[in-house]
């Protein structure tokens, strides 16, 4: 049976994911190292993991599999989940697959090297807007339908 795993630390689409999961009657796990208000929705389980690097990521990677959906902005976690057979979406609705994860990992590593080479660089990524939320909702809807046929 399909489950939805949310890497909740710094995830801007938790409430949107909950609405879609509820509509599909899919169990949703919101995984974090704390600081989240638990949902009253019986389909949503808030999982609080101990503090530490990548503890939430390991919890998700150890449990997801074929027919499950993972929402994360963490590219190494996405790679592990894809390897386990899960379908993976970024917060903006972009699907990460076995066909594109290698390039995404390489781009991530290149950007990390470029940031490290320029200690005076300021600013971050672009802001997360309505269009991103809309793409996420559409992507999650399609991905959950696909996952239902796999698991």
Curated annotation (Swiss-Prot):
Domain of life, per lineage: Bacteria
InterPro entries: UPF0178
Stretch forming the signal peptide: none
Pfam families reported in the protein's UniProt record: DUF188
Protein family: Belongs to the UPF0178 family.
UniProt name for this protein: UPF0178 protein RD1_0321
Organism: Roseobacter denitrificans (strain ATCC 33942 / OCh 114)
